[in-house]
């Protein structure tokens, strides 16, 4: 019902009240001028307009508080109206009838000295409410003599109320001159407060928050104190200062003042003294200097450059668009039709591309109540929809409860179901029963039994479905305004067919709109453009500037100099970015618009306290401000702390020289990291876990209080913590992060399966193990493995020595004969070249005896030595086999003997164990007979024990299970804490590694961060980090600082000063790259002094406390204690305790172990040797033939070119000159010549 009255307010209030009271004055229709605006601005510096926070005291504190305060520097409006005996009808309408919104601050003049004798009211009455009728509450503060009568009641406010300073009812039954009530109204508060009647001004602070109304009061221009508060539950929407009717005393004038300014929710900086009194207040968003004060939380901020963040372009106009000349939907005609269906056969009608007035509709159908689902009812006014569908049917008054949202009554179960996910409003209204015909009754005549009529009216229900909010041309006209012109190039507030916001319009030519389309969106759902259906023009919409403003503030200046970064001044002042309408001076720089400073960038300063970046500096001089009235004292200059050519002149190191290794080369590293951010959620049925389905246990569990509730509460907290952390991680991932996946790389199979070891060679300590013998040990290359074949043979100690001797030269075969136990031996394996050589020698010896007999000697020796080598190897293997067989036989005998001894010992042990087991069984039987509480079954306990004992046993079981459950819950809490920390770490790594490139070493992977990717993983995130890791370093002499000319110091910025070829240069800490020292890589210091601080030495106390002896503690505990042992009367004589004697068996086992140890096989060393076999002779023959062919080819080329004949001629002349001409001598028979 409340929504209906609120929504009907704009159309039903012609004046403030609903009833015309008996008036003692006249009224007319003369127009009244608008409320005057004060020349005095709101000044909150001393606390005026603020209030003391309820129930809080602050001493000697400066802190930020958020509340409902006026805007510092704003103006007051005078809402006081005065007359003698005549009222104007225009006084009771806007703008005097004003919106209350968050609240108001009022500065009221006390007129006691100007009112006539006998006057009871010294200032006007104020009323604050919504409907000002007997169906809603109204707050009234009415003066009477020296008190303020405050009340919150359901008053019926008069249509033309006023405040007389000297009441005269003339005998009429008038309660006052502002309300009339036949019977006493319902009141939430009625109290009287005294005030200082001698104070010239009174100050009131009214605001509402969360349905509660607060009132504060002061009689001095300072912070107000608490007056009263009351919970109303309704939203107060309007207030009105009643006209003050009074005839002043002769010779004086009466001009009441009721200055009012609205309140907003704002942040203030307060300063409290030692008595808790507010001495200073600052509105943080009122000016640039105020934001600096709030940013530093100091009323006297220090000199520096501050980044201001609370500045957004203020709109300078309004663009309002609705489709013109749309017909009326006429929804009310269909709602008031004579034929109304029953719930079984409800009807629906859809309205589209038309206008409707919700206020008129509700008034027309005489609505009883209106409530909305998934939308605020007050927001429906003025909105547009794609379409509006209305379902209606008659309903008995007694069954209306079935249609409540979330109810599963009979009507929603069998007839009409309300969709709770849809945006809809539920309307109950009634029509005269004589004008309505109910049709389509249910066959069971259920509705006939309940009936639809109450007090001669038919009860009807309508469900209004609002489809496509702010996306169509079916609009409510309650708050509709006329269309305005589209202002381009400036920041404006817009309402385009129900879509509201602010932005900058720019006209463009676009052909991508269809005839039914008017709005353009981007991929994120933001409005990016629109087509004006009135003019058919198209526009793009860009957001208004919301950027960074740097304020250079000097503590001796009253205001700062400003730098609007990355925008020019024309945009700043065209779009009302600056709070200053007419700044003293401003200009454009390449950093942005500079305000309140002179342009002196052609000048350079060596020192600067206000650095703006990019080598620019703001300088302030108080004398310059006083001398030149057109200057604020600030100027923008160039900052040059030193000249580069002076760096190496008269330079001394500050703090000494140090050797440091700086990386010079890097390699890219890959690191994968998993971080858990979530875990499975757990819920426990505590009662079922502890008691199962046992009723007695569950009943006894109740006595344990809220333990089970606490368990579920803790688990819910754990689950909520997991949800919140997952939402935070998801939020971090959704803001500019794409979950990465491996891109196709054209390689079949995973990348990790590619083996790069053949390209990289042997790496690490496993080279010898993986190199297969001498190839790795002797450094055999991969080419040798490719060109030669390999063969393995047994080596008893001479093969490796032979190989070392030959060094790969096979002609040294017989020279490297080895001696083994006095016998000369050679390896039994021959290469192809060796076989060819020895075969050729043997063949020559056989073909030309006796002259070539000596050629067979190497072959014979080779064969004999190799047979010796083979025999020696076979002999060693045979001896080893004999040793193995003998040792194995000895081991089998020892093992058999050990098994015999073990079997004998186990037999004895078994007999003893069996005997003791029988004795223990007898003991348990006795215990079982004496005590019945053996089983843990609850049912058995209940059936076998009496009530007291059963309860004790159930308590024991419950305590045990609750202890286990408590331990589990504790573990869940600790695990959730770990997950919370790991999720926070994941968010940090998403922000610092994925979204940016961190400067932290080894935080995003190992080394300096390059790139990070994030992938989903079970219960967490998998980060893939790429970083570059140093591989080589440069040792350089570094200095923590330099001293120039003995009085000016320099410190490196993110690096070091190094000596490079006798000159000082700068290099980064991550990479050695000397570069000249400039202001970009260094920081200037005012002196060269170094302050040394020594950290205190702290040692942990490692002494052990002197604890008392356990015996002493037990003696203290047992002191004065008396214990009586129970008489169990057990038959202990039946327990036959047998002592084992296993000495002989253990000795036998020891002998067997000794024999096993003696069976160690000391085999003669037989190694495995790997040798390389070269290619066969025909391969080398082919290679030789190829070489001969190449030589012949070269000779042929020489002959063809003429080079060959020249060479032969020279050779021939040389021989002739040396020996002369001789006849050839031929010897025919060598043997005859010898004779």
UniProtKB/Swiss-Prot annotation:
Compartments annotated for it: namely: Virion membrane; Host endoplasmic reticulum-Golgi intermediate compartment membrane; Host cell membrane
Q: How is it modified after translation?
A: Specific enzymatic cleavages in vivo yield mature proteins. The precursor is processed into S1 and S2 by host cell furin or another cellular protease to yield the mature S1 and S2 proteins. Additionally, a second cleavage leads to the release of a fusion peptide after viral attachment to host cell receptor. The cytoplasmic Cys-rich domain is palmitoylated. Spike glycoprotein is digested within host endosomes.
Describe the location of the BetaCoV S1-CTD domain by residue ranges. Answer: 327-477
The segments labelled Heptad repeat 1 in the record are 881-931
- Tell me which parts of the chain lie in the Extracellular compartment: 14-1176
Q: What's the chief localization of this chain? A: virion
Q: Where is this region: Receptor binding site?
A: 1-330
**Which positions form S-S bridges?**
21-158, 153-187, 165-246, 284-294, 329-354, 372-425, 384-475, 805-816
GO CC terms on record? host cell endoplasmic reticulum-Golgi intermediate compartment membrane; host cell plasma membrane; membrane; viral envelope; virion membrane
Q: Name one Pfam family in it.
A: CoV_S1_C
- CDD domains per UniProt: HKU1-CoV-like_Spike_SD1-2_S1-S2_S2, MHV-like_Spike_S1_NTD
InterPro entries in the record = bCoV_S1_N, BETA_CORONA_SPIKE, CoV_S1_C, S2_sf_CoV, Spike_N_sf, Spike_S1_NTD_MHV-like, Spike_S1_RBD_bCoV, Spike_S1_RBD_sf_bCoV
**Membrane-traversing stretches:** 1177-1197
Q: Where is the signal peptide?
A: 1-13
The UniProt annotation puts motif KxHxx at 1231-1235
Q: How does it assemble?
A: Homotrimer; each monomer consists of a S1 and a S2 subunit. The resulting peplomers protrude from the virus surface as spikes.
UniProt family annotation? Belongs to the betacoronaviruses spike protein family.
The domain comment in this protein's record states: Fusion peptide 1 (FP1) and fusion peptide 2 (FP2) function cooperatively and have a membrane-ordering effect on lipid headgroups and shallow hydrophobic regions of target bilayers. They are considered as two domains of an extended, bipartite FP. The membrane-ordering activity is calcium-dependent and also dependent on correct folding, which is maintained by an internal disulfide bond in FP2.
Query: What protein does this entry describe?
Result: Spike glycoprotein
Its source organism is Murine coronavirus (strain JHM) (MHV-JHM)
């Amino acid at each position: 019902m409340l929504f209906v009255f609120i929504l009907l307010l704009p159309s039903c209030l012609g004046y403030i009240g609903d009833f015309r009271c008996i008036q003692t004055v006249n009224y007319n229709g003369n127009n009244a001028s608008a409320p005057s605006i004060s020349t005095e601005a709101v000044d909150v510096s001393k606390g005026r307009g603020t209030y003391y926070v309820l129930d809080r005291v602050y001493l000697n504190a400066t802190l930020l508080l958020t509340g409902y305060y006026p805007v510092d520097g704003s103006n007051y409006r005078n809402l006081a109206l005065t007359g003698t005996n005549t009222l104007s009808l225009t006084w009771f309408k806007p703008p005097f009838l004003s919106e209350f919104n968050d609240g108001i601050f009022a500065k009221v003049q006390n007129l006691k000295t100007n009112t006539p004798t006998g006057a009871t009211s010294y200032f006007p009455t104020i009323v604050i409410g919504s409907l000002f009728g007997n169906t809603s509450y109204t707050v009234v503060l009415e003066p009477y003599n020296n008190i303020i009568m405050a009340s919150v009641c359901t008053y019926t406010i008069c249509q033309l109320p006023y405040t007389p300073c000297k009441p005269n009812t003339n005998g009429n039954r008038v309660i006052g001159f502002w309300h009339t009530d036949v019977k006493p109204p319902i009141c939430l508060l009625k109290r009287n407060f005294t005030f200082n009647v001698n104070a010239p001004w009174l100050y009131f602070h009214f605001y509402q928050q969360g349905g509660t109304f607060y009132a504060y009061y002061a009689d001095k221009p300072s912070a107000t104190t608490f007056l009263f508060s009351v919970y109303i539950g309704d939203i107060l929407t309007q207030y009105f200062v009643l006209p003050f009717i009074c005839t002043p005393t002769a010779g004086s004038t009466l001009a009441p003042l009721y200055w009012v300014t609205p309140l907003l929710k704002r942040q203030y900086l307060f300063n409290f003294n030692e008595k808790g009194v507010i001495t200073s207040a600052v509105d943080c968003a009122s000016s640039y200097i105020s934001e600096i004060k709030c940013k530093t939380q100091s009323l006297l901020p220090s000199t520096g450059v501050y980044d201001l963040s609370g500045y957004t372009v203020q709109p300078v106009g309004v663009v309002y668009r609705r489709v013109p000349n749309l017909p009326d939907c006429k929804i009310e005609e269909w709602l008031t039709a004579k034929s109304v269906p029953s719930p079984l056969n409800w009807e629906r009608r859809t309205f589209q591309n038309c206008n409707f007035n919700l206020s008129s509709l509700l008034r027309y159908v005489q609505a009883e109540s209106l409530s909305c689902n998934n939308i605020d009812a007050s927001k429906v006014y003025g909105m547009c929809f794609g379409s509006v569908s209305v379902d209606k049917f008659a309903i008995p008054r007694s069954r209306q409860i079935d249609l409540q949202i979330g109810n599963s009554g009979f009507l929603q179960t069998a007839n009409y179901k309300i969709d709770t996910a849809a945006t809809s409003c539920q309307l109950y209204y009634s029509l005269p029963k004589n004008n309505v015909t109910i049709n389509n009754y249910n066959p069971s005549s259920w509705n006939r039994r309940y009936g639809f009529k109450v007090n001669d009216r038919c009860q009807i229900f309508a469900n209004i479905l609002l489809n496509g909010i702010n996306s169509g041309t079916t609009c409510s006209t309650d708050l509709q305004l006329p269309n305005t012109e589209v202002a381009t190039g400036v920041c404006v507030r817009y309402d385009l067919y129900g879509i509201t916001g602010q932005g900058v319009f720019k006209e463009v030519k676009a052909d991508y709109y269809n005839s039914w389309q008017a709005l353009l969106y981007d991929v994120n759902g933001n409005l990016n453009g629109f087509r004006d259906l009135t003019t058919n023009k198209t526009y793009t919409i860009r957001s208004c500037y919301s950027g960074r403003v740097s304020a250079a503030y000097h503590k001796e200046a009253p205001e700062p100099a400003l730098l609007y970064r990355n925008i020019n001044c024309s945009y700043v002042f065209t779009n009302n970015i600056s709070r200053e309408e007419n700044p003293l001076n401003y200009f454009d720089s390449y950093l942005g618009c500079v305000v309140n400073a002179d342009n002196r960038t052609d000048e350079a300063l060596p020192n600067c306290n206000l650095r703006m970046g990019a080598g620019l500096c703001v300088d302030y001089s108080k004398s310059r401000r006083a001398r030149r009235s057109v200057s604020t004292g600030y100027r923008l200059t160039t900052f040059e702390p030193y000249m580069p050519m002076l760096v190496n002149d008269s330079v001394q190191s500050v703090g000494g020289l140090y050797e440091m290794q700086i990386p010079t080369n890097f390699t890219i590293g890959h690191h994968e990291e998993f971080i858990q951010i979530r875990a499975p959620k757990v819920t426990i049925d505590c009662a079922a876990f502890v008691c199962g389905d046992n009723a007695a246990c569950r009943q006894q569990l109740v006595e344990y209080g809220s333990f089970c509730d606490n368990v579920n509460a803790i688990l819910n907290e754990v689950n909520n913590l997991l949800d919140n952390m997952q939402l935070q991680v998801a939020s971090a991932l959704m803001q500019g992060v794409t979950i990465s996946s491996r891109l196709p790389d054209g390689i079949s199979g995973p990348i990790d399966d590619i083996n790069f070891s053949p390209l990289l060679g042997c790496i690490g300590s496993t080279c010898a193990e993986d190199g297969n013998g001498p190839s790795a040990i002797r450094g055999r290359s991969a080419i040798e493995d490719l060109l030669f074949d390999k063969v393995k043979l047994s080596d008893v100690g001479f093969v490796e020595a032979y190989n070392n001797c030959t060094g790969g030269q096979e002609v040294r075969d017989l020279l490297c004969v080895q001696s083994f136990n006095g016998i000369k031996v050679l390896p039994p394996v021959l290469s192809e070249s060796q076989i060819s050589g020895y075969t050729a020698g043997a063949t020559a010896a056989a073909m030309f005896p006796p002259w070539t007999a000596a050629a067979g000697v190497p072959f014979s020796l080779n064969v004999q030595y190799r047979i010796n080598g083979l025999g020696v190897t076979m002999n060693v293997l045979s001896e080893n086999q004999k040793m193995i067989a003998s040792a194995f036989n000895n081991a089998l005998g020892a093992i058999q003997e050990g098994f015999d001894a073990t079997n004998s010992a186990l037999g004895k042990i078994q007999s003893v164990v069996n005997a003791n087991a029988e004795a223990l069984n007898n003991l348990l039987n006795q215990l079982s007979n004496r005590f019945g509480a053996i089983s843990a079954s609850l049912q058995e306990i209940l059936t076998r024990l009496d009530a007291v004992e059963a309860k004790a046993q159930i308590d024991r079981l419950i305590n045990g299970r609750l202890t286990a459950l408590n331990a589990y819950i504790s573990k869940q809490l600790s695990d959730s804490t770990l997950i919370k920390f790991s999720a926070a770490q994941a968010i940090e790594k998403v922000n610092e590694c994925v979204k940016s490139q961190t400067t932290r070493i080894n935080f995003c992977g190992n080394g300096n961060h390059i790139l990070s990717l994030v992938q989903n993983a079970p219960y967490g995130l998998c980060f893939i980090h790429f970083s570059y890791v140093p591989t080589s370093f440069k040792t350089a002499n570094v200095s923590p600082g330099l001293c120039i000319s003995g009085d000016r110091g320099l410190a490196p910025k993110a690096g070091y000063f190094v000596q490079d070829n006798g000159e000082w240069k700068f290099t980064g800490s991550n990479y050695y790259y000397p570069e000249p020292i400039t202001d970009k890589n260094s920081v200037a210091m005012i002196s060269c002094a170094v302050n040394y601080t020594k950290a205190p030495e702290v040692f942990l106390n490692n002494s052990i406390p002197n604890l008392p002896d356990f015996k002493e503690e037990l003696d203290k505990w047992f002191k004065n204690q008396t214990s009586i042992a129970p008489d169990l009367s057990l038959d202990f004589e039946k327990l036959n305790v047998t002592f084992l004697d296993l000495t002989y068996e253990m000795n036998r086992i020891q002998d067997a172990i000794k024999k096993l140890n003696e069976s160690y096989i000391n085999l003669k060393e037989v190694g495995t040797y790997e040798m390389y076999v070269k290619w066969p002779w025909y391969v080398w023959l082919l290679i030789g033939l190829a070489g001969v062919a190449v030589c012949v080819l070269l000779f042929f080329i020489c002959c063809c070119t003429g080079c060959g004949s020249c060479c032969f001629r020279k050779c021939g002349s040389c021989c002739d000159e040396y020996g002369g001409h001789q006849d050839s001598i031929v010897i025919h028979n060598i043997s005859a010549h010898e004779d």
